[in-house]
């Protein structure tokens, strides 16, 4: 039986980033995933500056940033009014491109086996891992990074606790101008009314395409979902009638991808020799935009802090594993992610006085910041003025308020 230091179960973003980071440490590492090339998968499609900062702490990821498209500037709008033009900090990249690019960063010292982890027999010293090929490998540590797949966790005696079923739904599609080119580099347009159950649509470049992510709070069997899938342009126009005042006429030329988000956390995780990261431990709401940051935080703390400590001494008991889950940096980000998931939902759809006040406060705050930035641009002549046409008129209406 082959003996190694670390086996990683799952080669999505969490597993591939972990493998790339550990491959530079000298620890004998094996990554197990059935896909030779990671297939198309509608998940995270951009990274913001905070996520990039954590990614860079892992020591890997520069290739991902080179493969991504930086937006340069992002416009913010609501009710058909341009509120703010802020510096862009988001890198657009499709999830499968991100994962496959990260895999290209895995050094040859990491052995990649195209199979599935079927079972893990744990102990306080070494773990016996059984693969779908029948091969068995002995590892000091098993990193479970297999995302939403619960079979292995159930075999390990862990349980999934649901927090919020179908907490939100993300719809992804390309948006193209039906006429003149889009005048904005990137755009976030917020939902117009709580009854629309829509947080926002964000438009951002991925290569030559303008990608759209629409975030809604509905059930999968809501007739509106089928309506959007069948007639996306008309349904989007009815949902956000003011959007075209910013974008101009648009069309949705291709397929609409739909991804519901169930919020859950895995319990009973403090087992010897096995640690969970990313969605294997808990999920996040894509509307809140914290999922990728949570993955990178898990990987950074695990690879930079805990694994070096664990491998420096004999054994791999549950007390070592517990230290990772109790890590203050990691715990703080997980708490932030969970809090933001419910905060954004309440700000979007709750109709109580305090929530209505928060929505309007955010609206006027963005408008005020936008006016100050525009005044600074005009005074310093350091940035271009707002484009002409419908966008110019929308900004002018906002500025007069």
Each PLM stretch: what is its role?
Residues 14, 37, 149:
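Conserved Rossmann-like nucleotide-cofactor binding loop
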Residues 2, 53, 57, 64-158, ...:
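Conserved N-terminal helical subregion
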Residues 220-317:
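FAD/FMN-dependent oxidoreductases across multiple families
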Residues 304-401:
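C-terminal helical "tail/cap" subdomain of flavin- and related membrane-associated enzymes
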Residues 128, 145-245:
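Conserved FAD-binding catalytic core of PHBH/FMO-like flavoproteins
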Residues 1-14:
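Beta1/beta-strand and adjacent pyrophosphate-binding region of the FAD-binding site
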